[in-house]
Amino acid sequence: MSPWQFTLFRIVFGSYLAVHFLHLAPWAGELFGKDGVLPDPTLNPTHGLFPNPLDLPLSDGMLTALVVFLAVVSLLLAAGRWRKPAAVVLWFGWTALFHRNNLIANPSLPYVGLLLVLTLLVPGGEPWSRGPRNADWAMPKWVFRTAWILMAAGYTFSGITKLPSESWTDGTAMKFLLDNPLARPGWMRDLMLSLPDGLLKLLTWGTLAAELLFLPLALWSRTRPWIWLTLVLMHLGIIAVVDFADLSLGMLMIHLFTFDPAWLRPRPSRPILIRFDGDCLMCSRTIRFVAEEDRAKLIRFRPLDVEGDRAPDSMLVESGDRTLDRSDGVLAILSTLGGHWRAMAMAGRLIPRPLRDGLYRFIAKRRYRWFGKGDACALPSEALKERLVP
């Protein structure tokens, strides 16, 4: 995992937690209060296993303030401000809420807690974080492997626990899910309900098989990305048809953390040339980032000749005999970086080009006003210096 990949994960994960807590805030008193659904904390099966200050008879206002406070801390985590203390506070709050009301349990809760612990153990100094950059930053291999081992074991264990359930073995679980009051109304649910019962049974058994086989398939490098993707698609499907997205969103966080950038190689595999506005501070920072992330060293840089080439609000990407500009150029750069950046490029191509180009032009016209001016070639980093061409 590269420094920028971890930064991307940190932003998404912190944002997810902030939204989670903000959605929880209006119901904090009802869920965790002395006059709520579980007024006596000793009724929880896990009571006494965790030193929980929420066992005190707190007012609804205090509980709401606590949950909002956790949302604010989540934003600090996303912004890279005091990441490690924020992770400790969030882990404690996350655990305390569960032990105050075990009825909120769902399979993603322990994985979110795991990610908070791992986020605490990852060294500091990643991009967009408080404090100096660590040029030698690296994700500890044991952290990445721990996440993979526990995720794979959890999925297979989940499949094993489903085997005694008649609805999973006879294939009717999917139909029960779609008929459940929590099913999300809409065309997707209606479409799935219109499918033959035999196909719904195959979907049920396929889901069960994917969970059971996750651990053994994760042990083999060739099948690992495919079983990872299968469960990602399963969770996206659950979000589409079940009106309880929090379970799957939490699991998607562990999938984001365990994504291996080596699965998506740079494309194209031949070098490309980026011609950029050297007076634009945003452009300067962007090419420094690209040079840092270009592990395959496929990208070269040259400042635009504004008078001879193109108006300064454009960036050109030369790939073979093609010259790309605007959003097509950005997507070509992301594809060349490979990994999660290539995945973002694949998603970006699903957006109609006029919309992509419109957003590009909107930012380009305001880049000097928003970001100022700066010379990318004045003090280039080592990664950039060797890529600049006259």
Located regions from the model:
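Thiol/selenol-based redox catalytic cores and closely related redox-interacting motifs
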Residues: 305-390
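Alpha-helical membrane-anchoring segments
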Residues: 1-276, 281-308
